[in-house]
Structure formats: C-alpha cells, structure tokens
Amino acid sequence: MFISKAKYFFQLILSLTFGICGVFAFSPYDFWPLSIISITGLLIIILSNITWKQIIWNTLFWGIGFFSVGLHWIYIGIDQFIPTHKNMNFFLIAFLIIYLTCYSVLFSIILVTLRLFITQWSFLSITAATLWLIIDRLRGNEFIGFPWLQFGYSQISGPIRGIGPLLGVEGITFCLVLISSLLALSIRTVQPSPYYISLIILACLYPLSWIQWYQVQPQRMTTIALVQGNINQHLYWNTENIQKTLKIYLQHTLPLLGKVKIIIWPESAIPGNELAHNELLVSLDYQLRKHHTYLITGIIDSRLINNSYYHHYNSIIVLGNTHDPYKYPSSNRYDKHHLVLCSERFPLQCLFEPVFRFFNIPIAFMKSGPYIQSQLNVYPIKMTASICYEIILGNQIRDNFKLDSDFLLTLANDVWFGCSIGPWQHLQIARMRALELGRPILFCTNNGVTAIINADGSIQSQLSQFISTTLITNISPTTGFTPYAQFGSWWLLIISILICIFIIYIQKNQLFKIFTFFKKNK
C-alpha cells in the first residue's frame, strides 16, 4: 500500500515537472526540444494509468506546472497596478490557471476514452494530435479566449518552423503533438516503429524552412524609427506628468524630422484623449508634413455620443500625411477590436454600463473597434495594425491582412509585467505572425521588447528593456501570399476531424464490443 502511494505521489511530481519544463521551450529560454519532452511526458503518464482519478490528477498537476510558471507574469501586472487585496490577486491568477488546466484535463479524458477502442498506435497518434488541435481552438476562442502558450510558438527557431507559412502556429502544434504521441507510444509499447516514423516526419518537415514564400522589395527600403519611452505606468495618467511624458517622446522625435520616413510611438503614448490634445496634434502634424515624415502613435479616443456620454477607444492614428492634413476625427486610424478582460472590458459590461451611466459613476468602459478595418496608409506604405494582445489572435490578423500590405504593425505597453518572461513571450508570438504571413513586423513597446522582425520571423534589430531610447533602422517591405495567408488553417482541422471519424468508423467493431461489455456489467 505504501509503495503504491509512493508511486502515485512520484507520478504527480513527475507530471508537475513535465509541465514546468514545457515553459522553457518558449522565450526567453527558447530550448525548443523541451516542448516535445513535455507533451511526450504527459502522454506517457496518462496512457499508463488505469483509473480516471489518476488520469485527472496527473493532468491537473501537469497543467498547473505549465500554466503557473508560464503565466506567472500576469500576477505581477495584477499585483502592481490593480488596487485589490493580495489574496484576491492570488485567487484571480489561481482561477485562471485552473480554468486553463481544465482544457488539458478535457484532452486527457477524451483521449483515454478513445484509446479504449482505437487499438492501432498510428490511429491513436493522429487522434491525439487532432484532439489537441480542437482543444487549443476551444481555449483560444471560447469564454475568455486565451490562446497564450500554444506549443507551436516554441518552434519559431526550431526545425519544423517551416510549417508556419503553410498552416500557421496550429499546424506546428499539430505536428509537435503527432511526433510526441509517436514517441510516447514507442516508449509505452516498447516498439521501435513509432520512434522511427517520428524521426522520418521530423526529417521531412525540416526542409520546409528553406522555402521563402515572400519577395523582398529592396527598391522600397524605408528608414523607420521606433521610440521606446519607458514611461513609469504609475505616473502615466497623472495629469501633472502628461507634459513630462510628451516631452520625452518629442525629445526623441524632433531631431529625426526629415531624416527618417516613419516614426512610431507605442500604445497610448499620448496620455489623455485625442480631442483634448487636438492643438498639439495639429501643430505636430504641420511640422511632420513640412519635413515629409510620418508619425504613427497610440492614443485614447473619447467620442461624444448623443451629447451625453463618451465611447472610449484604444486607437492608433497617423500624422504627417501630405495628402490629407490631420483633422479630428481622422479616418486614417485603427481602433482596437479585441479588448483585454478585466482591464479594458468587464464581464457583463453591457448590463452594468447603462447603470453606471445613469448614476453618473465615472467608469471608463472601452469600446471595441470593428473586426475588419482598413490598413493604415503611410503613403506609399500600407500596414496591417494591431494593438498589444491582438497580435496573438492569428485569425484576426490574417482576416485583416491584404495582399498589398507592406508591414505588420503592433503597438504595445508591456510595462505591466516588469522584468518577467511575459514581454519575451509577446515578442515570440509576434515573430510567429511575421513567419505566417511573410511580412516584417514593426513591434513598438513602451518599455521593451521593442524590435524589428523580418518576414521569416527572425529579429533584425531590437532594443534593451527599461531604457528610453530609439531604434532606427532601414527595412524593406515584402510582397507575396503565403499558403496560410490565403487559406488559413481551417482545412487542417477539417481534414483531421474527417480522418478521426474514419478511424472511429473502421474501429466500430471494437467500439461495439466495449459498449456491450459495459451494458452487461451495468
């Protein structure tokens, strides 16, 4: 009895360890083989257990290890900038971790159930990869919609990164789980065949990274400056510090007028609402047009509705357009669509907002911009824009992406997460978007990591964190459509589900036997 309990406890610790080691496959560590080890370890453990209790608890420990270490930076943001009790902060992050872990538990329960009648290891491997893909879709789209820490991102510098332009990050994740499940079954059944097949798959996928799906346009090379203000978030919205904040950005910007084509400031670089800074924006726009330089900046836009209340938008605007001088509200803008839960939007917001408005309670609810928006025009450059968290939403970025897009643009403010791994994971996700769509990304943040990302996902240049400085570089736009940009990854999901249905169909005799057995022993 003691040996049995000790073995069970050891399994739980092992599951926790496998979950934790998966985090080190992501940035800033970037040791990509650990993703395979983490998934393989989970599969070996759940396929080795015979009771539902063991399967559920081991998966829980794996998920807690993976998500608590991988997402601990969220607690930093909550603890430093949201005025709630520490116990409440801990409860919020614990709830998020358990919620995300439930998706891993769902995967394990369904996979072990299917294993009862899917007897061939090749069928089980495909089923595991398809099931993981479906669960990842659910985690990324349902309820709070949080697709962070998808294992495909860990391969941005790995040997199967070439799948990115074909099938996106989901395709990479699918192949990772397929390879991991083959390794797990090889170890579990002591058969060499699955192991050899996993090596063959890896060898076949590696040459895909040699294909260049885009064409560089060196004749259109542009000089771009990304300004990293490094503004203290505690002082950001303090009215006494607004002029100081603007002074920092202007000190970096004014000497560059006429020397660079495009200057970029980060998310909400200009404190306060757009209309309140109209005089500054008009004056700055005049100076920019005079020197033939563009400025792209983040700003909060407060629009008066029916002369009674305001709609607030997290926006990006463009100044310096010689074809169209700035005038509020300018059409050359982007309004953030996907708002962050408990920061920019709140649960049941549609119910509470009219109540707060009726009692004149000063709560600044943010509004979403349209899902599909026009590109930013920085003549003759066109950019597909996103703000902060939105860069993780691959489908939204792809749906807004156009064939004539020259660059992808992301403005962010990761000061919330201090010197944690969060900003590095954010940058890694942006690198994957560049690889998927074959376009360079201009990634400008308040305190880092500000970077220029090439169309193949590699980093051309970047700034150190926590300093106020400017990144100036020459970069060429690219053209061309990757297969992922044209078709997305839906067809992978559909084909995988059809294969699984076929597998279940040809295994129907085994399914019937199991059903009969349970019916007799009911």
Swiss-Prot record:
Catalytic EC class: transferase
The protein's Enzyme Commission number: 2.3.1.269
Keyword set includes Cell inner membrane: yes
Tree of life domain: Bacteria
Pfam families linked to this entry: CN_hydrolase, LNT_N
Annotated GO MF terms: ATP binding; N-acyltransferase activity
Pathway named in the protein's UniProt entry: Protein modification; lipoprotein biosynthesis (N-acyl transfer)
One annotated GO biological process: lipoprotein biosynthetic process
Cited function: Catalyzes the phospholipid dependent N-acylation of the N-terminal cysteine of apolipoprotein, the last step in lipoprotein maturation.
Name of this protein: Apolipoprotein N-acyltransferase
Name of the encoding gene: lnt
